[in-house]
Amino acid sequence: MSSTVISRKRRNSTVTEPDSSGETRKQKKSRSDEKSSSSKDGDPQLEFKVLQGYRDLESEMHKGRAQVTRTGDIGVAMDNLNAVDSLFNKVIGIKNNGLFAHDARAMVSISELAQISVRNLKFDDSRSMVNLENIVNSLKRYMLKEHFKLNNIAENRNDLTLAADEQSAADQQEESDGDIDRTPDDNHTDKATSSFKATSMRHSYLQQFSHYNEFSQFNWFRIGALYNTISKNAPITDHLMGPLSIEKKPRVLTQRRRNNDQVGEKITAEKITQHSLNSTQQETTPEQVKKCFKKLSKKLGPEGSINLFKFIIDPNSFSRSIENLFYTSFLIKEGKLLMEHDEEGLPTIKIKQSISHTDSRSKEIERQRRRAAHQNHIIFQMDMPTWRKLIKKYNITSPFLD
């Protein structure tokens, strides 16, 4: 529904008024007209006549208020507006504030009539009004475009729409051919008839969307975006406002707890000397390697061999197992131990035999043969899960290097 807005602009330079043909005519006033208009200031008969016209118009508007309230006819307000404009055109140039006060009061009354008319519009009772059913079906058509596109549904643009276009073209042709013979009343009747036909055809066209009532068929985001684009709602700032009622939390006085922990015995750090550093270093590297070799020689003998994992793994300490692997790598590097593969391809270690030849030439040949022998470098990595799996696989219950 389009709202009716009543407004008019009055200037001393120009005056716009409708003529019988519907066209607007502008009357420009020159300086000579302004001089001649000063003669109206002293015309009491004209002022009295215009004043009487304003009073009669106010009486008519008072009577028309009941009609507007009952029918919602906006034409009453428009007729009164035209009457006020004609009265105002008669007093242009007259300096009489009393007449201007009556004119302003009349404009206020006309605005109230227009407001009452818009408020009391009764839809569906008159074909000149907007039909509520057509509004709903038009909204459905707007929101069903995506549904029609996804389901390959075509709008039923029946012959009524085409007939309306043809009828409109024919009416225009007849109007151009018979303008000489037609009267203004006939033209007005033809326009009303064409408008009635167009309204009926549009109503029939929109009926095809009336049976769509499922919520999921409509694109509600589309109508929301349209409303957000063309609506005049003021932006709100509710999201910037905090809670309106903030209760002040009462302050709770707490008593600090005394520390009753007993003070332990005072301990000072041990002083580090050069002798203690040397002794610690001897225990952690070379001595541990020597102890590891002595235990292997004592338990296996010169000819025995043992699985590498059974030799290094300590089932009670993961860190100790890593240390044993570290010591074993030193023994292999220095040529004290020899690592081989058993029948299953698992690594085994044994004590490397010394050269037993008495002849110096034979010793040198054996030494060169051992140097030329193929050597493999292995990077062995052991983590906690692997360590547990090896203990379970070989059923290791006690460390070999205890």
Swiss-Prot record:
Report any Pfam family annotated for this entry: Nse4-Nse3_bdg
Q: Which residues form the signal peptide?
A: none
Region (Disordered) residue ranges read: 1-45, 166-195
Q: Name one GO biological process term.
A: double-strand break repair via homologous recombination
* Start-end of Basic and acidic residues biased regions: 22-43, 179-191
Kindly list the GO CC terms recorded for this protein. chromosome, telomeric region; nucleus; Smc5-Smc6 complex
Location of this chain's protein in the cell: Nucleus
Q: Which UniProt keywords apply?
A: DNA damage, DNA recombination, DNA repair, Nucleus
Question: Tell me, what does this protein do in biology?
Answer: Acts in a DNA repair pathway for removal of UV-induced DNA damage that is distinct from classical nucleotide excision repair and in repair of ionizing radiation damage. Functions in homologous recombination repair of DNA double strand breaks and in recovery of stalled replication forks.
Q: Which family does it belong to?
A: Belongs to the NSE4 family.
What is the protein's quaternary organization?
Answer: Component of the Smc5-Smc6 complex which consists of KRE29, MMS21, NSE1, NSE3, NSE4, NSE5, SMC5 and SMC6. Interacts with NSE3.
Per its record, how is this protein called by name? Answer: Non-structural maintenance of chromosome element 4
